[in-house]
């Protein structure tokens, strides 16, 4: 009503002014319509508008439609009964089942390959060389470090990746900086990367822990007694030794939930002889990761710690590109056990294998995965060790090798209770452990079975475990990323 009276007064005032100025009636009507239109449009703008006094909400802005990440497929939200619900034939223990639901996420089509993991290795190599190019003890070249912005203001020093490394035609100092990361084999005389120096340092903010009720009163200033927290920190000693340790201390600020980790990222190529001590596997030790012939085979010999570091690097690598355009993306990570199982079973509780039937061979008699169908029968499926990715058909989501080939790390901590400790909504059970914690606490869930396992152990509903600092010739991994809300 108030708006209506206001508009009538505006009409009367406008008419009187136009008449006084001897403007013709037709032109008067046109001008009055424009005035009233402007008044009404102004009244509908902003939070204080008068759209009948209704709650209309604010402008939502632009919703980013996330494109499909390279080499990934979308696993759509779904529900399954997780676990086999059968009695273990060896121990006589019934493995529990649990109905669970999982939201949308992107998942790598294949296991991470040797070629993809080498990109990580070479990035770490190049970052160390660039650090040494800028180090006065080596080349001392300021161009390799950015210390100020475009306006000349100081910034946190960081590497300048736009300056190429002078692999050829370099100075004596530059050559020394490059060679400091290499060594010569004392027996063969071959020049090779010094894998012991390939350390990757990363930080992460434990947002979930910081949000817990036991910490919030102190952080918000409503409590004075500081609760105890565990904080991961890492450093390198003067003699080059990496030290990762967990500190327990009173909470002082939100920064106590920022953790640091330093991980040596080179795969354990000796796993081929240590996993099979009475076997002639030296060829795989020398060639499986190094030889280009295995470039598209799944990387193995990586620990859970290394796989997690790879996910952190992959996130860093992507965000440095897309953040320049103002785009925010979720981080890459290892899948939870629930995510992995739902993806492998095509979100169908009846599926025990990714291909939907209980038969391990197709109608034509061909094996449907790379596994060990009988004692010593590794080559029955035409593959002796991990096969090239995509050697077998994908499941309905478009995921390859979710059974056999290389077993895969998950983010989930292993307990005998299985999924009983987890929520039924996006379930996860994950614990941080210190280097000196007992072995059982270090175990992580491994899914999918491998090239060396029999048919029972490559079922999607089964689970295995391994210590988080052990690299095995049968364990690899793939990454996932939560889909951004609003994407189609």
Residue ranges and their predicted role:
Residues 46-52, 74-75, 81, 86, ...:
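Functional-site microenvironments in short loops/helix caps that host divalent-cation chemistry
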Residues 136-246:
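Non-catalytic, alpha-helical, charged scaffold/linker segments
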Residues 473-488:
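Short, structured beta-strand segments at or near domain termini in extracellular proteins/domains
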């Amino acid at each position: 009503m108030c708006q209506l009276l206001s508009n009538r007064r505006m009409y009367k005032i406008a008419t009187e002014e136009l008449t006084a100025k001897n403007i013709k009636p037709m032109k008067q009507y046109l001008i009055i319509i424009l005035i009233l239109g402007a008044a009404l449009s102004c009244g509908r703008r902003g939070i204080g508008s008068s759209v009948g006094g209704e709650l209309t909400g604010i402008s939502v802005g632009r919703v980013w439609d996330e494109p499909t990440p390279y080499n990934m497929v979308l696993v759509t939200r779904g529900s399954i009964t997780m676990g086999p619900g059968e009695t273990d034939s060896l121990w006589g223990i019934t493995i529990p089942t649990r109905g669970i639901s999982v939201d949308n996420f992107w998942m790598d089509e294949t296991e991470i390959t040797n070629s993809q993991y080498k990109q990580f290795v070479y990035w770490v190599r190049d970052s160390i060389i660039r650090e040494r190019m800028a180090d006065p003890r080596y080349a001392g070249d300021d161009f390799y470090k950015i210390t100020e912005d475009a306006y000349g203001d100081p910034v946190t020093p960081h590497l300048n990746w736009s300056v190429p490394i002078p692999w050829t035609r370099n100075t004596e100092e530059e050559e020394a900086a490059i060679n400091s990361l290499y060594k010569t084999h004392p027996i063969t005389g071959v020049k090779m990367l010094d894998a012991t120096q390939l350390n990757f340092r990363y930080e992460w903010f434990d947002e979930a822990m910081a949000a817990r009720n036991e910490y919030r009163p102190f952080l918000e200033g409503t409590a004075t007694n500081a609760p105890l927290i565990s904080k991961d920190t890492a450093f390198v000693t003067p003699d080059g030794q990496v030290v990762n340790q967990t500190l327990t201390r009173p909470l002082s600020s939100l920064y106590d939930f920022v953790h640091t980790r330093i991980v040596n990222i080179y795969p354990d190529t000796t796993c081929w002889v240590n996993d099979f001590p009475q076997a002639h596997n030296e060829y795989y030790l020398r060639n499986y990761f190094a030889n280009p012939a295995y470039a598209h085979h799944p990387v193995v010999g990586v620990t859970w710690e290394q796989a997690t570091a790879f996910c952190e690097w992959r996130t860093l690598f992507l965000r440095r590109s897309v953040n320049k355009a103002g785009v925010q993306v979720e981080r890459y990570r290892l899948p939870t056990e629930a995510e992995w199982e739902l993806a492998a079973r095509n979100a169908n509780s009846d599926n025990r294998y990714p291909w939907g039937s209980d038969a391990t061979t197709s109608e034509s008699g061909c094996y449907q995965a790379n596994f060990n169908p009988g004692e010593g029968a590794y080559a029955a499926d035409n593959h002796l060790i991990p096969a090239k990715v995509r050697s077998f058909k994908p499941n309905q989501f478009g995921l390859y090798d979710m059974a056999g080939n290389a077993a895969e790390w998950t983010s989930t901590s292993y307990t005998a209770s299985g999924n009983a400790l987890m929520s039924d909504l996006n379930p996860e059970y994950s614990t941080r452990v210190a280097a000196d914690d007992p072995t059982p606490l270090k175990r992580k869930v491994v899914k999918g079975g491998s090239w060396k396992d029999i048919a029972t152990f490559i079922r999607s509903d089964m689970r295995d475990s391994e210590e988080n600092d052990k690299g095995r010739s049968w364990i690899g991994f793939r990454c996932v990323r939560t889909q951004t809300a609003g994407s189609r």
